[in-house]
Amino acid sequence: MSNWTTYPQKNLTQAEQLAQLIKEADALVVGIGAGMSAADGFTYIGPRFETAFPDFIAKYQFLDMLQASLFDFEDWQEYWAFQSRFVALNYLDQPVGQSYLDLKEILETKDYHIITTNADNAFWVAGYDPHNIFHIQGEYGLWQCSQHCHQQTYKDDTVIRQMIAEQKNMKVPGQLIPHCPECEAPFEINKRNEEKGMVEDADFHAQKARYEAFLSEHKEGKVLYLEIGVGHTTPQFIKHPFWKRVSENPNALFVTLNHKHYRIPLSIRRQSLELTEHIAQLISATKTIYQKS
């Protein structure tokens, strides 16, 4: 790894090292998971969850919002009572995250592409170029046929607001349940299901094609695979592909921003760096150093 002049350097702070590696990189492939939004305060546990869903917690003893969002509700009226509030909280009304703004200022100076397992609004509200983002797990603001009868997504924020306003006893009025125009099955949120997968429409495939083209263009050279807030729930989307590409490019570097330690394959440990400081604080400090250098 001698081709990276700033790796490794133990005399640097984590922010100093990250800033220098970004500056030195020919290109960045950035994988972003739930930990980055959580670092900005958009957590799925605690008061944020408990304030929005006290009735659902009382009925089902949910431990967190992720568990609740994946629950098999008793009917579509209850499903949409929960999901409408969930969509408003995590998509329509979620404010901008400072770490996303800070990261954008850094990335705009580089050749980069982002893949994310997040389905919230974080990139849109922060003003990212959509052509540089691949939402591989779907988006909370979109709907799909619950039977996956055709590959098209839909959107109607007004109906979501109406569901929230008119729901009673954890049920939305039956007439507000959206239905597929092709097979008349109820709509559901466009989010990948472990068993069923998800609807992947033309826009999804366009996002995927742009991402894959970027990867093809940067198989060689100093490519920084930067993983931010990615756990081990769905490693097949970011973590494992990053490992593979780093192993195939002796000039690539794998850098993780995460307060947790995850096992890194022995084969790429000499090309890896773990940064464990608070994600939002580390990105902010990195931006300051990067812009001064």
From Swiss-Prot:
The SirTM-mediated ADP-ribosylation can be specifically reversed by the Macro domain-containing protein encoded by the same operon (SpyM50868). One of its GO terms (molecular function) is NAD+ binding. Zn(2+) binds at C145, C149, C180, C183. Changing Q137 to H/T: Loss of catalytic activity. SUPFAM superfamilies: DHS-like NAD/FAD-binding domain. InterPro entries: DHS-like_NAD/FAD-binding_dom, Sirtuin_cat_small_dom_sf, Ssirtuin_cat_dom. Its EC number is 2.4.2.-. Keywords: Glycosyltransferase, Metal-binding, NAD, Nucleotidyltransferase, Transferase, Zinc. The lineage of its organism: Bacteria, Bacillati, Bacillota, Bacilli, Lactobacillales. It catalyses: L-aspartyl-[protein] + NAD(+) = 4-O-(ADP-D-ribosyl)-L-aspartyl-[protein] + nicotinamide. NAD(+) binds at A34, T117, N118, A119, D120, Q137, H232, T233, T234, N258, Y262, I279. Belongs to the sirtuin family. Class M subfamily. It comes from Streptococcus pyogenes serotype M5 (strain Manfredo). Binds 1 zinc ion per subunit. It is an enzyme of class 2 (transferase). Its cofactor is Zn(2+). Residues 8-292 form the Deacetylase sirtuin-type domain. It comes from the Bacteria. Changing R192A: Dramatic decrease in catalytic activity. This is Protein ADP-ribosyltransferase. Catalyzes specifically the mono-ADP-ribosylation of GcvH-L (SpyM50867). This activity is dependent on prior lipoylation of the target protein. May be involved in the modulation of the response to host-derived oxidative stress. In contrast to other sirtuin classes, lacks protein deacylase activity, being unable to catalyze debiotinylation, deacetylation and desuccinylation of proteins.
